[in-house]
Each structure stands twice: as structure tokens, then as C-alpha cells.
Amino acid sequence: MERCSVAQQFEDRFQRKFYYLRLSITDVCNFKCTYCLPDGYKPSAGRPASFLTVNEIRRVVSAFAHCGTSKVRITGGEPSLRKDFGEIIHTIAQTPGIQKVATTTNGYRLAKHIGEWREAGLTQLNVSVDSLDPRMFAQITGENRFQQVMSGIDRAFEVGFEQVKVNVVLMKNLNHLELPQFMAWIKTRPIQLRFIELMQTGEMDALFARHHVSGISIRDYLFGNGWLLKARADNDGPAQVFIHPDFQGEIGLIMPYEKDFCRSCNRLRVSALGKLHLCLFGEQGIELRDLLQDDHQENALIERIQTQLQNKAETHFLHDGNSGVTPHLASIGG
């Protein structure tokens, strides 16, 4: 079968190359985070969702790998809710060309399973920890599992992870004053703490107005206290990462409302239902699943993705209050 050469790497009309696939494997989540699924997961009306199978995942990852993608992040929902999660990790890790296999998890299964996930081929781990105060953690997530999640992070280091990334969604009047506690936590731990600005989605207008706070004040603090901006790799995510000689940990800032945020976009998304999303805040996804049924469909799959890439907008339209059709971040993997 003819493969994509390096010259045929996935690229849009703005000369952005795509090294990074965010692949959702389920919409289901067992937490009730204020900024995502405050009422818990509710299946869509109509027939039950049929999420991508392992073979469909293998085919879509193979197509991306043949066209220059080197990193896959497995997302959800909560990806570890899938009973075949370990098999999915292994399948992706065995794909020629894939160098990094990451996942983002709420951490509730970490302590028990992170060892087997690492053995399956997981190379990077992100855990959502929106507060270091157990009561605030429970208020934000709807689950009293703070100690369980923290034990999972400790276990990740025990089984050999050299760094764990911790995601914190910044929310005014909830956790935005915890910076000193977070800084103390990463002083002696190799944790990359990633502060993520609250993003507006279709179902969260009121929450956004009440709790959005910019990451600029944190960046100003970092620059004023000896932190240095770290260079980005081709397949890194959108975070601006800062390092300090006195800290084992790092700090990342993800600020989607900042000017030129989209200029360095290097990632595409495939939903758990097999739809290609050119942007987290774009319109309806592009159907890929009909081309994931047989290995011999790969050329057609690649051609469809490459064609649709030429429709990728130069930037999102969040500043206009347009968050696309994304109802909440669990729907296409955040």
C-alpha cells in the first residue's frame, strides 16, 4: 500500500503541520466537574453511542502516523473507564512512527492500574487536580476522591514515570488563590503544573462569566520571580512552559484567549464516535468511521483528512463569543 512521505505530512493552508492527535475513546465520565459535566454524564438522545473499537483505533492512528503524527493523547470522558484501555494503549504504542503515547485522566484508577498502563506503552501522563484542598477538590469535581488521586500520582512515580503533568482549570473564587500551595507542592516534585484558562462552551456561558480568570497574572508573576520560558518541541501541546533552577517542577500556562494562540496549532482531534474535529471550538465533525472498517481503506482515509484540513480556520472565534458546537469538553476530549 502506498504510504504518505514526509513531504505529504498533514498540513493545512496556513503551513501548520500536525504532529499530535488527540483521540477520544469515550464520552463517559464518572466525575461531575463544575466546568465540564456538572450534572454528570448523560447519554445523547437516540440510539446508544458505539465508541471506536480497538481495530478502528488502530486504523486511524496508523493513518495519522503515516502522515507525520508522532504523538497520540488518549482522552475522554474518562478514558480509563474502558475495560480495554490497556489494549488500546498497547495498540497505539505498537504503531510504527508513534513515539509518545499520553493520556489525560481524572486519576481515580491510577493507583491500581498505572503500572500495567506503563507496561502497555504509556509514556506520558496528565492528571486533573483542580485543587490541593480536599474540600475544594470535592466541590469542583463532585467526587470525594482527593487522596485516591494523589496516591495515584505517587504510584506513577514509583512505577517509573520521570514526570507527571497535572492539569488545573483556573476558576475565580474557587481555586485561583491556591498558587502558593501549588508552587510549594512542585518545589521538590517533578510535576509539570499546567494552569488552564476556563474556556467558554455551549452549555457553560454563565459559569464562564462567573469564574473566568486570565493566566496573564500568573505569567507576570513567573517572569518577575526568575522563571524562564522553555522551548517547545514539534509535538508538544499548547502550553507555555516555565522552568526555574530552584524547582524540580515546571509550570505550564494554557491561555486560549491570548493573541496568536492558534498560530502554532499542531494537533487534530478524533472523537470517540470517529469524527475528525479540526478545532476544539469548530463546527460539526467530519465523519471518518466509514473509512475505518478495513485496512485497505487507508489511502481514502488519508485523502479525506488531508482534504478536510484545507478547511481548518486560521483561528478560533472565542473572542466573538463563538465556541462552535462543542456542548462541553467531554464531548470531543477537551
From Swiss-Prot:
Amino acids binding [4Fe-4S] cluster 1: 29, 33, 36
Required co-factors: [4Fe-4S] cluster
Domain of life per record: Bacteria
UniProt GO BP: Mo-molybdopterin cofactor biosynthetic process
SMART domains on file: Elp3
The keyword Protein biosynthesis is assigned to this record: no
Binding positions for [4Fe-4S] cluster 2 per the UniProt entry: 262, 265, 279
Gene3D superfamilies membership: Aldolase class I
Domain Radical SAM core: 13-239
Enzyme Commission number(s) from the entry: 4.1.99.22
UniProt keyword annotations, A-Z: 4Fe-4S, GTP-binding, Iron, Iron-sulfur, Lyase, Metal-binding, Molybdenum cofactor biosynthesis, Nucleotide-binding, S-adenosyl-L-methionine
Alphabetized SUPFAM superfamilies for the sequence: Radical SAM enzymes
Cofactor comment: Binds 2 [4Fe-4S] clusters. Binds 1 [4Fe-4S] cluster coordinated with 3 cysteines and an exchangeable S-adenosyl-L-methionine and 1 [4Fe-4S] cluster coordinated with 3 cysteines and the GTP-derived substrate.
Binding site for GTP: 22, 73, 104, 165, 267-269
Top class in the EC scheme: lyase
Entry's family note: Belongs to the radical SAM superfamily. MoaA family.
NCBIfam families attached to this UniProt entry: moaA
Subunit structure: Monomer and homodimer.
Name this polypeptide is given: GTP 3',8-cyclase
Species assigned in the record: Vibrio cholerae serotype O1 (strain ATCC 39315 / El Tor Inaba N16961)
Primary gene name: moaA
